[in-house]
């Protein structure tokens, strides 16, 4: 992914979305190397926050899309967006230009234990946090975290965000054949967090070629009752 601003693209979770890539042209900059990542295997591990793309450049590219029709502005892109130290500055600048469009942050939750990260993202309208496992072995197998990133930190970080975030908090669980048997355990942690919405997803884009079938995914929604749950098959 080389575009700084891309789309709009249709999202089953959020509608027509204009994407913001804060991380630039490197194939992937992330604290994870998930086995289902659509960006592929290339990329670098990183957990130090810095500015990858100057704010003015991002805003310049954003303004080129102002005549397009989109329902949300989604901060995602080529890796983990909270690694970008200018995430709040970019968000604030975009809000000055497009006050009426909700801003969505997609995060893998690994940096939410940092106070400065929490402070930087509180103004988003929607934050969608990843939680694919609650067992250490499954976490390491699916998400392939860089050294020093632990499952405990991820879960505690999401709980920390929940306590201070006033917007809509959703949790995304990527359901795969290797973690489908763990979804009940995941649901118990999710209920403790008490998000506004749960997204039971399954990968449908390359390099992953075997999404969980509708007949297996839909019944899992019951495990999260009474929380609101959505799937790509709804």
Could you tell me what each predicted segment is?
Residues 12-53:
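Canonical Radical SAM [4Fe-4S] cluster-binding loop centered on the CxxxCxxC motif
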Residues 24, 40-43, 76-79, 143, ...:
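Short, histidine-centered active-site or binding-site loop motifs used for metal coordination
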Residues 83-212:
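Conserved AdoMet/S-adenosylmethionine-binding subsite of the radical SAM
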Residues 1-13, 24, 59-60, 66, ...:
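Auxiliary Fe-S-binding modules of radical SAM enzymes
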Residues 15-17, 34, 70, 126, ...:
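Structural motif
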Residues 48-55, 147-151, 210-217:
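Flexible, glycine- and charge-enriched loops at secondary-structure boundaries
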Residues 40-74, 89:
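Conserved alpha-helical substructure of the radical SAM core
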């Amino acid at each position: 992914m080389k575009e700084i601003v891309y789309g709009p693209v249709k999202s089953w979770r959020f509608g027509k979305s204009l994407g913001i890539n804060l991380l630039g042209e490197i194939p992937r900059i992330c604290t994870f190397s998930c086995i289902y990542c659509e960006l592929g295997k290339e990329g670098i591990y990183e957990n130090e926050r810095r500015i990858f793309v100057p704010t003015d450049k991002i805003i310049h590219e954003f303004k080129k899309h102002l005549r397009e029709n989109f329902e949300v502005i989604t901060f995602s892109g080529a890796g983990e967006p909270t690694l970008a130290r200018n995430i709040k500055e970019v968000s604030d600048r975009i809000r000055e230009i497009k006050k009426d469009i909700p801003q969505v942050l997609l995060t893998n939750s690994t940096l939410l234990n940092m106070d400065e990260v929490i402070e930087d993202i509180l103004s988003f309208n929607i934050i969608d946090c990843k939680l694919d496992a609650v067992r250490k072995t499954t976490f390491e197998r699916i998400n392939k975290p860089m050294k020093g990133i632990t499952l405990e930190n991820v879960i505690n970080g999401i709980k920390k965000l929940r306590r201070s975030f006033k917007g809509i908090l959703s949790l995304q669980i990527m359901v795969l054949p290797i973690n489908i048997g763990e979804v009940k355990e995941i649901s118990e942690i999710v209920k403790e967090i008490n998000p506004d919405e749960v997204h039971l997803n399954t990968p449908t884009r390359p390099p992953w070629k075997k999404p969980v079938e509708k007949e297996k995914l839909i019944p899992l929604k019951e495990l999260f009752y009474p929380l609101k749950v959505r799937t790509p098959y709804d």
